[in-house]
């Protein structure tokens, strides 16, 4: 994504490195990394479930799918959603997840709901949640944080997530040295406001976890 590339450019600038952008055949990424023809994988690369295969930077984006409920709903776990009416945005990652029967999919959970209602946008869905027409919302964590922040108290995100998806920079397993340099640079770029500026430019401020 543009965010990844501009952040990579900013790190290279700090180090006096030349950024070489290399399109990857996804199947040969490990070969390229291990042979040294690339130094890292930096493009919306999900670290969860891959921790044993790469040395990862600090995660910089959280794209997990979560459940939002009214604070006083009495809903605390995913199991509590049985028989409830759950809202989700049409054509969203959360909806895909709730329909998926593949490993990591949550169709079994969705089958316990009383109803799964699709909405064109989250503003409408939150209005329905507020009115009590919905018991819960399935939504990505960035949007959830933004909506809750802008609407004030009265909502909570369940501790149990539908899935966990954090993006990090993947280095060859054991290449801690390069990873440490990049982590230190990410910290500098966070402190000087570069990360926040880029996050705003690409409209992902609520997903970026570098603070």
Model-derived regions: residue spans:
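Short helix-initiation/N-cap motifs at beta->coil->alpha
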Residues: 20-31, 73, 112-127, 165
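Flexible hinge/capping segments at coil-to-helix
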Residues: 69-86
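Alpha-to-beta junction loops
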Residues: 16-18, 34-43, 84-87, 121, ...
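A ligand-binding cleft/hinge motif common to bilobed small-molecule-binding domains
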Residues: 28, 44-53, 97-100, 128-164
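Extracytoplasmic small-molecule ligand-binding "clamshell" domains
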Residues: 1-44, 201
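Ligand-binding cleft/hinge of the Venus flytrap
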Residues: 8-17, 94-118, 148-152
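Periplasmic-binding protein-like
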Residues: 62-69, 94-97, 141, 145, 149-202, ...
